[in-house]
């Protein structure tokens, strides 16, 4: 009897623990950068010019709510998308080749992914962080309008000649009222 009670208690504890670590309950989410002591800390992710940024003041996107400064994302079958109510998706790709060095970008509609790039491999981990192929992301300062450019970890600490890049946790935050946007190419 004691063993049965112990097993039931352990099972309940494991279930409660797993529930606390699950991915967002909503399909749509925003992302903020986490790196304590850095200017990128708590900066929201946005999309512009076929790239992903943190802390960009203006996305110059065509949105239902144009004053919002962050992008809305969703994952489907391991692929990451920018949310739009239209039937024309904008899908994220990653180029981890020697040329791409972890470049994260997006294509629109039927555009093919660039050579050497990957679309699948996105997931939200038990800490509620977005990762690509099980790795956290990288943020590099001094991009357009003072924003941070966002890169996948391809084993290059400062990709594409950037300097002072930092590893970040890309924290996922539920969005209950997604902002439909078409982002600039």
From Swiss-Prot:
Q: Mention one GO biological process in which this protein takes part, according to its record.
A: sporulation resulting in formation of a cellular spore
Known InterPro entries for this protein?
Answer: PhiA_domain (IPR052820)
> Keywords for this entry?
Allergen, Cell wall, Glycoprotein, Secreted, Signal, Sporulation
Classify the source by domain of life.
Eukaryota
Question: Where are the annotated glycans?
Answer: 60
What is its induction? Expression is higher at 32 degrees Celsius than at 17 degrees Celsius.
Q: Where is the signal peptide?
A: 1-18
Cystine pairs annotated here are none
- Tell whether Glycoprotein is among the UniProt keywords: yes
- GO CC: one term? extracellular region
For whether the record's keyword set contains Glycosyltransferase, the answer is no
The record's subcellular locations are:
Secreted; Secreted, Cell wall
- What protein family is recorded? Belongs to the phiA family.
Q: What does this protein do?
A: Cell wall protein involved in development of asexual structures such as phialide and conidium development, and thus required for spore formation. Plays a role as a general stress protectant produced by the fungus in competition with antagonistic bacteria.
- What protein is this chain from? Cell wall protein phiA
What gene, per UniProt, encodes this protein? phiA
């Amino acid at each position: 009897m004691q063993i049965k009670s112990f097993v039931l208690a352990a099972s309940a504890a494991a279930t409660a623990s797993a529930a606390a670590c699950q991915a967002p309950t909503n399909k749509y989410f925003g992302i903020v950068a986490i790196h304590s002591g850095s200017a990128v800390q708590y900066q929201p992710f946005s999309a512009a010019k076929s790239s992903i940024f943190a802390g960009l003041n203006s996305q110059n996107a065509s949105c239902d709510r144009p004053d919002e400064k962050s992008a809305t994302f969703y994952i489907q079958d391991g692929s990451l998308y920018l949310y739009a109510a239209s039937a024309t998706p904008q899908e994220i790709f990653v180029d981890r080749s020697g040329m791409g060095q972890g470049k994260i970008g997006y294509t629109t509609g039927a555009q093919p992914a660039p050579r050497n790039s990957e679309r699948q491999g996105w997931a939200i981990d038990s800490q509620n962080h977005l990762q690509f192929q099980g790795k956290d992301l990288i943020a590099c300062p001094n991009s357009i309008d003072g924003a941070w450019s966002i890169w996948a970890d391809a084993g290059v600490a400062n990709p594409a000649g950037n300097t002072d890049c930092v590893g970040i946790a890309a924290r996922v935050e539920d969005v209950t009222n997604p902002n439909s946007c078409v982002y600039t190419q």
